Amino acid sequence: NITRALRDTISKDMEKVKEELDKAIGWLSNESIVLVAERPTILKDILFIGNDYISIEKTEVDNKNKKTLEVYALDNIEEERPIKLSDIVEDGEFLFKEGSQNIQSLGENVILNQSNVGLVRKNGYWILKGRINYRQNEEQLYKDFNIKAIPPKTMVSYDELSVPWDLISAQFPDGVDAFSSPNGEFIVVIIANELQIYSTDNGEIFSLEPISKIQIPNNASIIMSEWALGRYPDIWENEMIKQGALNIE
């Protein structure tokens, strides 16, 4: 059973994760969508969720579909107050301005707001991304840019690859993302609509024959990565199956 293989990985307080995840889902489903004549005016898509933070992309339907990025601390998510980059990263204001410098001259009414940040996946890692919104010919547009800072441990507790991304992309040209187990014994490679799991040893993929393949929906995206041991794999497996997930042997 794939979940049982996780027993040898890093310990996590998974009960806290489940509690925070339930809180975030409740917030998104109950408070983040305002209905007017049965039509949503604000949509929120999850980009990342961890033990303490959630990153979303917000679409304001009644404002020409303006799209912004926001990060919330789960402890006070009900306050609807996104955090600023400088709240989580040293010199955050400077790093935001530095990253956006080349695109600040775009269009009209450029909005520079260091709360307009999010977490996304790139080359097997979580990275911080900033966004600038602007108007052009009355159209709401935006440009994204990378922020030269590593997400803090309070946001992403484990984010390592036991196999270098260059080697992964060379062996799997169609691979779009990858996750390594903390004990370095296996790697999950995302290819098209599949999670493919491979054994690894000493920073190399042991065999190109996958241990297992797991189908995922088309255009699905990874928003969370957690590792567990002890009783937590079984707890999470049972909880996910209750929510409609497949039991994978």
Regions found by a protein language model. Give the residues of each.
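Generic hydrophobic, helix-prone segments enriched in Leu/Val/Ile
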Residues: 3-7, 46, 128-130, 222
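Hydrophilic extracytoplasmic domains
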Residues: 145-249
